[in-house]
Structures are given as C-alpha cells and as structure tokens.
Amino acid sequence: MSAALPAEPFRVSGGVNKVRFRSDTGFTVMSATLRNEQGEDPDATVIGVMPPLDVGDTFSAEVLMEEHREYGYQYRVVNMVLEAMPADLSEEGVAAYFEARVGGVGKVLAGRIAKTFGAAAFDLLEDDPQKFLQVPGITESTLHKMVSSWSQQGLERRLLAGLQGLGLTINQAQRAVKHFGADALDRLEKDLFTLTEVEGIGFLTADKLWQARGGALDDPRRLTAAAVYALQLAGTQAGHSFLPRSRAEKGVVHYTRVTPGQARLAVETAVELGRLSEDDSPLFAAEAAATGEGRIYLPHVLRAEKKLASLIRTLLATPPADGAGNDDWAVPKKARKGLSEEQASVLDQLAGHRLVVLTGGPGTGKSTTTKAVADLAESLGLEVGLCAPTGKAARRLGEVTGRTASTVHRLLGYGPQGFRHNHLEPAPYDLLIVDEVSMMGDALMLSLLAAVPPGARVLLVGDTDQLPPVDAGLPLLALAQAAPTIKLTQVYRQAAKNPIIQAAHGLLHGEAPAWGDKRLNLTEIEPDGGARRVALMVRELGGPGAVQVLTPMRKGPLGMDHLNYHLQALFNPGEGGVRIAEGEARPGDTVVQTKNDYNNEIFNGTLGMVLKAEGARLTVDFDGNVVELTGAELFNLQLGYALTVHRAQGSEWGTVLGVLHEAHMPMLSRNLVYTALTRARDRFFSAGSASAWQIAAARQREARNTALLERIRAH
C-alpha cells in the first residue's frame, strides 16, 4: 500500500487474519491482509462497522486510511461486502473456514471435508450437499445443520450485498436487515422510502439514494414519505404534535420541490394509507369548517395525545384512596411548620386531589415544599416514589428531599421491551413526586401517568417558564391550566439578594439582566475569535472543573462543537485519542453522555471524566460510576466542556459561563436565556453581546401545536 495518507476513501480487497473485537452493533476491530493495485498490507488494522466476520473470510471494501497516535496506521471501513469464499483455498484454509463458519462442523470433521473435497467443498455444499455423507462422521443430522448454517450465511450475504447494491452503506444495510429481517431487500426494492422506518435513517438519506438511482421526483412513494417527514421534523425540531394541513403541504413542497397541487395529493395519500392521521374529532369540526383545513398528526402521536388526555381526566375526576377505598391524608399543624401559606396549600390540595401541579421560579421554595410533601406522606405510612427526567435532576431531587430519587425511566423499569410498569403492572407507590416536569414531552408523560396505581397521588413539579421539552408536546403547560395548580410567587429573603434570581425574574417581565455585579457580569465578544476568548475566560474563572460553559446551539463559531474544540485545545492539548461522536477524547477530557445506556447505567446528560484511553476503548468516571466504553458506545459521547442549554436543563452548577450573541439569532428566546441563567447557583457570567440578551428577553417562544388542553377540557 502507499505510505501516503489519501484524503478520499479507496477500494481494497482482503482477507481476515484475526478478529480482535466485535460489539453487538457490528463495530469491529480486526487484523487483515489488504491489497489493491498499489500493493499489499499483510497486517493491516481495520476498524468500523462490518458484517459478521471470522478468520479466513474475504471481502471487498471502501476504506479511509488514518494515523493513530498510539497504534499507527489503520483503515476505517466506509463500506464492505463479504465474499462467499475464504481467501485461503488450500486444504488448511478450507478446513479452517469450515470449522469457523459452518454449523455442526468441528476441527476433525473440517479436516476430513477439506481432505476429501478441497476447494470444491463450497460449490458442493451449495449445489450437491448429499455428497458430504461420504465423509466419515457426517450424518443426516449433521448435514442438515451444515446446510442450514450455510444457507443462512448465504442469505445474509445476499441481503447485505443486495442492499449495498441499492446504495446503502454497510451500517445502513445491517440496520435494515435488523428491522425488516429476510424481507429487507424485497421491501426496499418495492419502495426505497420504507427505509425511513429504520431507526437512524431519515427521508433525506433515502431521497439521496432514490435520486442517485434516477428515481422520478414526482413518484407518489417519494412524496408520501416527504409528507411523513414533514410531520416527524415538526415534532423533533419544533415540538409540534400536529401541523395544520397547509403547513404539512408546505413541508412537502420544501423537501421535494414539487407543485402545491402535488403536495396536497401527497398529504391526502399519506392519510389514506394510514401513515398520517387527520383528527376528525367533533372538538375541532368548527375550526376545520372555518379554516378549510384539518389538523394532521403522525398516527402514534395522535393516539398518545388522546390517551394522555383520557388518563389526566381520570386522575382529575377520581378521589385519592388506597386499594380498599380508604384515604387517611391529614395535614397536622407540625407539617406546616416553616411553610408559607401558598407552600402549605400544596399539602391541602393533595388531601382531595390525585393530581396536583406545583410551579414557580427560582428562590420561591419549590424544593422546600417538595420535601414537606414527602415528609408528610411518609409520616402517614405512604410509599413515596421520587423521580425526574434526567440523572442530574434526579440527584438534585434526592439531595433536597433527603431521599433516593431516580430517573423516570428507571422508576418505570425501562428495558429492551419498554417500560415494565404500566396500567397492567403499576408502579408500587402511593405518591409519585416528579421534578423538572418542564422537560417531559407527551410520550414520557403518558408512560408515567399510565403507571400510576388506582387511587394514588401525583405531584408534578416544574417551572413553566423554562425551555419546553425536546420531545413533542407541552404537557406541563396544559396541566398547569387543567389541574389544581399552586404557583409559588414569593421570593425568599436570602434568594432575593442573589442577583441571578433577581435577573431571572426580570427576564420573565421582558427585562435583560443588569450586568456589573461580581456575581453577574457580561464580556462583549464577537464570533470571530470568540471561542478562543471563551476558553481564556474559563481559565480565568478556575478551569473546567470550576465553571460550566453553556450555549444555545451546536454548530457555528460560538456553537457547542467549536467551543469544545477550543476548550479541549487549551485545557487538554494533544494529538490522537479515541474517536467519539464529535472529535476525539483523551485522558483528562470532560465528556457528556447523549443517550440513555441502561447496561452501563449512564443516562442522557451525565457528565464524566475520561480516565484512560486504550486502543478503541475509553474508561470514564461518571460521578463515581466508572465504566469502560467501546464500539458504538463511544458515539454516545461528546466533549462536555461546553453544553447546549437544552442539554443542561435539569442540572445546576456553582458558576456558569453563558455564551449568547446575535449569531445565535434563530434560538434567542426568553425561555432559553431564563433556563441558561437559572442553571447557575452562585455566579453567572456571559460572553457575547448585551443586545442579544435584550432581543432574547423580548422574544417569546413560538406556540406549539398541541391539543392536549382542549382534549382534557372537552369532557
């Protein structure tokens, strides 16, 4: 092979020498012999997502050449197709291949097969398997295992090769096989856009493959998929549960560049096929008649919204009681001790209601009230469950109440098959206290309330002025208007002296912070060179362990990725490292988990410190939970010196450095800066521009399209 490092992927063929590591997701590290017209590398390190491989397997692949600081040159697989024959067709090679890859064949039998048939054994197994009965030791039962094993491998090879022939990468092809099974190729040949049903593959990817194959731009399959994509994106990017029909049609036009008439037909077709749903509820008939358009949902979102409204109505309409129909909730005088009148009213509301909402801004005593509720419930002999959407928020809830709290997912017993606790097997609590409810979308709220036992109570705690949830829906806002709700308004003396809390309450009235306090200040920076300036400010404030950087966006000169690059360069410089989702991680780096990992008990948003980096493995300390991560697990990590404000929701730090500039204009809103500011306990410093804060303070968020409140009130 050439000693130079080509910038673009190139083609090679090769054979497997040794598989060193393989994860459940297909991420593999192996030693292989690679060759192309430029030469041969007899002991190449090859990494990436690959089909199941064993010693002796042959393949063709598209690879990128990289240089690792510790391990030297390695080849990263972009795409790979497994061949049907081993590289070594000698007697020893055939024997090794049969032993490793063909079911029912051990070392002795493999040697006999190789000696009897040599390289012809593969064709015979495919075309005339009965001849194997000539080999001593092969019975009808053994032959059946051999043929079944070979057929299964052949099917998988043909599937993967066929899918890659459609233009899919090996990673996409394996995902498709996992999702559709043996029907994967047939399904995608009939409609390539069914690829969008596969987790992690969206319309834009499928459309790129479609256009590369010369597919018609006005094909109904393409337009229907675009209509579904418009609704999916409305949920994931804007949190909408539905779109007015005209907005859905505009989405189709935007993503496909077809005419409005074709887009209208696409939405109609998607509804007829059941891939979208139009809400035909009498509740919205007058609106539809007046506007001439209905509300378009993804079917599962519409079902969830209706079911959630039904559950909430049941909780509001039924009295609290134990399994025998009794209720002994009483509020003695001592339970009110130290509480204001509005705080104590929460205890009284829980006497007669199963579902109560507690809201309020910083410094108003939500934590004190929550602890008082838990104390009273336990004094009455009730089982109390405490949870929050994220691990950090759960830890904070546990600290303020003096009890064990968990994530919502853990409390509900989340596993591969979903939640263990549901309406059939409710969670074993008489009272559920849920904090940071502003982070919960409709889907998670539905799972939570479905697991509430008959007669049990729920206290939902949150701040309606914070950022809305990442997921679709806005359940806290609806519940705060439909359920018994106590909004704490009194800011307590000690909190009132905190300039951060003063500024937070000012933001709610559209006022930008009054900078200039030693605990609340702003440094003007520009996007050009701004990330470097932020890194220097972090150093002045004591380094990454003493301050958390927050920013509205991931991308851009003042986005999370660029800030992390400069922060890592200043505080943990070096070359190489282990590849993660963005960049590389080295010992000493701060990282953040971006997905729940129940096997390792690491939850979305948890910060960790890299202790060790070896090969393609990282050892990370997540608040005392030391885990070794490898393969696809590494791509659930990002550098965590800087976080987005959304990622920081539910967390709190002593000192926060918030980056805010007009460069973040699409994201600037009152809820965003209020959430960023209230992540700081003691000191908040901003890098950016005062005018950006003024713009954000004056700008309310776009209303979300959700009908939850209307459905709750409809009965």
Curated annotation (Swiss-Prot):
Binding sites annotated in the UniProt record for ATP: Q343, G363, T364, G365, K366, S367, Q466, R493, R679
GO cellular component terms, A-Z: exodeoxyribonuclease V complex
TM segment ranges: none
A GO BP annotation: DNA recombination
Tree of life domain: Bacteria
Keyword annotations from UniProtKB, A to Z: ATP-binding, DNA-binding, Helicase, Hydrolase, Isomerase, Nucleotide-binding
EC code(s) of this entry: 5.6.2.3
An annotated Gene Ontology molecular function: 5'-3' DNA helicase activity
Keyword Cell membrane applies: no
PANTHER family: DNA HELICASE B, DNA2/NAM7 HELICASE FAMILY MEMBER
UniProt similarity note: Belongs to the RecD family. RecD2 subfamily.
Quaternary context: Monomer; homodimers seem to be inactive.
Task of the protein: DNA-dependent ATPase (ssDNA stimulates the ATPase better than dsDNA) and ATP-dependent 5'-3' DNA helicase. Plays a role in an antioxidant pathway. Involved in DNA damage repair and/or recombination. Appears to move along DNA in single base steps, powered by hydrolysis of 1 molecule of ATP. Has low processivity, unwinds about 15-20 base pairs/second. Short (20 bp) substrates with 5'-overhangs or forked ends are the best substrates, is much less efficient on 52 or 76 bp substrates with 5'-overhangs. The presence of single-stranded DNA-binding protein (SSB) increases unwinding 4-5 fold.
Name listed for the protein in its UniProt record: ATP-dependent RecD2 DNA helicase
Species of provenance: Deinococcus radiodurans (strain ATCC 13939 / DSM 20539 / JCM 16871 / CCUG 27074 / LMG 4051 / NBRC 15346 / NCIMB 9279 / VKM B-1422 / R1)
Gene: recD2
